[in-house]
Structure formats: C-alpha cells, structure tokens
A protein has these predicted regions:
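Active-site environment of divalent metal-dependent phosphoester hydrolases
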Residues: 58-61, 96-98, 153-157, 181-184, ...
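His/Asp/Glu-enriched short active-site or ligand-binding loop at hydrolase and phosphoryl-transfer sites
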Residues: 171-183
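Non-catalytic positions within long, well-ordered alpha-helices that form the structural scaffold/packing
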Residues: 44, 140, 197-198
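Mid-to-C-terminal alpha-helical segments outside catalytic/metal-binding sites
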Residues: 2-4, 219-240
Length: 240
C-alpha cells in the first residue's frame, strides 16, 4: 500500500489517454469537428502523444458499429493532420453491458478493441448487471482483456468494495476517471477512486472527456493529490 504524499509541482505524467468521446456527433460527446480539434490541441499541449477515443455503443441510444467508428476516426485524423497537431488518434469503444451486448458476444461480432486486445465496458450506475460475470467470462474466453470504465462511479461498487476486489480477482482491469479525484461526479466516487489508488488497484487512468467544459475540469484534476498519487502506480497507459 502506498502512502499519501504532498506534491509541490503537480504535473500531467500521462502521455496516453484511454477513454474519451471525441468523434463528433455519434454519441453524447463532442458535437462538431471544431470542438474535437480544440480539445485535441489542448491534450497535445498537456503532453499527450496518443488519444484512444472510445465512443459509446448502446443499442437503443448510440448504435455505433466498428464501421461507423472507423469512418469517423478516418475523417477526424485527416483534420488533425491538416492542423499539424502532433498527436496520434486511435479508437476503441465503450460497450454498455446489456442483453444486446451479450447477444453480440454470443454471435461472435467483432469488437472495437485497443492496444493488446483490451475492450472497454461500462454498466448501469445503480445495479450490477445479473450477467456481468458471464460477459466478462465470454470476453476473456474470446481472447479479450476486459477493462471496466470508471468503477468508482457505480453505486453498487460504492456500497460494497468487496465487489471491486472480486472483479480484480476475475482478471478485470480497472480504469479510473481523473475527474473523480476532484469530486466532479460525487463524494462517493471520489472516495472510491482514492481507495483504488491507495490500494494499487488501478490499471488505467482516463479523462472520459465529452466536451470543452470537462477539459477545463481535467486541467484542475491533474493537480489533485489522487491524480498525482496515481503517477506512482504501474499504470498500463504508457504501454499502449
């Protein structure tokens, strides 16, 4: 277990971000190419070299497919090149765990993964999906490495930290949102995020940026003790 320290010169030690919503117009993230470019330029100024953007895939709300995502990625990368922004852009996806996703897994649908076959998943915030363990097992059986997005935000995990330990024991990687260290989402999310850092249970940090307003909050988050503490962990961001 790590001890909390005081940092006199807070900095952004990350060069790779693994969670954002920067492909315009396909989910609840940025709405225009212009907004995407502004945010990406700011990421570059913060020292990022690579962004792995992860649009939502939720059947009844954001029915994105690998084809749709690939096309949007191609278009945005072309704009980045025009602006000469020195940053690499890749895309995965953020899959919502529900019966539709389970069906896709059973049908062998190709997924949007990143890095060494990592797949980012999310759940509803209130209750643990009854088939979450089945989804995790199926993904792992298919050769994917499961990454749970922002576990600190789920109420069912805030109420039972043992559930988080169980997820780790099952081979799930945990991705914490930097904004959680500021209390942006809730006090309970901040508390769990700090617990996960304290107990060295975090594998990835992500920005989960949806818009310029959140980017401003992110700049404050990198100064938080929780974020700086995470810099002492063996995070997998830099390996991507």
């Amino acid at each position: 277990m790590l001890d909390w320290l005081t940092f006199n010169t807070p900095n952004n030690f990350l060069t790779v971000d693994v969670h954002s919503h920067l492909l315009p117009g396909i989910d609840d993230g940025v709405k225009s190419v212009e907004e995407s470019l502004e945010i990406i330029q700011e990421f570059s100024a913060l020292g990022f070299k690579k962004l792995i953007t992860t649009p939502h895939i939720i059947k009844n709300y954001y029915p994105n497919t690998p084809k749709i995502i690939a096309q949007k990625l191609k278009e945005l990368k072309a704009e980045i090149q025009k602006k000469n922004i020195p940053i690499e852009l890749e895309a995965g996806a953020e899959y919502f765990v529900d019966e539709h996703f389970m069906k896709e897994l059973e049908e062998g649908t190709a997924l949007c993964s990143f890095g060494n076959n990592f797949v980012l998943i999310e759940t509803g915030f209130m209750n643990k999906p009854i088939f979450l363990n089945d989804v995790i097992f199926k993904l792992q059986s298919d050769g994917y490495k499961v990454v749970l997005a922002h576990p600190e935000r789920y109420i069912y995990l805030q109420e039972d930290y043992n559930e988080v330990h169980a997820l780790l024991s099952s081979g799930v990687h945990l991705q914490v949102n930097a904004l959680s260290f500021t209390g942006y989402y809730s006090k309970s999310a901040k508390k769990l995020a700090e617990y996960l850092i304290q107990h060295e249970m975090v594998n990835f940090l992500g920005s989960d940026i949806h818009n310029k307003k959140q980017l401003l909050k992110y700049k404050k988050a990198i100064k938080s003790s929780g974020f700086q503490k995470a810099g002492q962990l063996s995070l997998l961001n830099s390996a991507l």
